[in-house]
């Protein structure tokens, strides 16, 4: 819901929506913040096809932002699916937390925050 839509909803309805959203949070132990991406790479061999533009790969990496730095971490093919599932869980939970935060902000505006 947008902030303008939240302003039109009763406090009781906001509290009920917040409870429903909080109940939808799942598997916090599977939290993995980042973006799964695929990149091709060049090797160090002089006569290799990658020197002509045919890169090796694609290989999967997890791009994370931590300690004010962006980093990419290689994700082996054996854990690619699990890594992707963890990232999806995190994205779903973050979307729910964002909406819960917006509801709490609206409740604060109305002086109804518990």
Per-region residue spans from a language model:
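A positively charged, amphipathic N-terminal helix/segment that binds anionic biomolecules
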Residues: 1-114
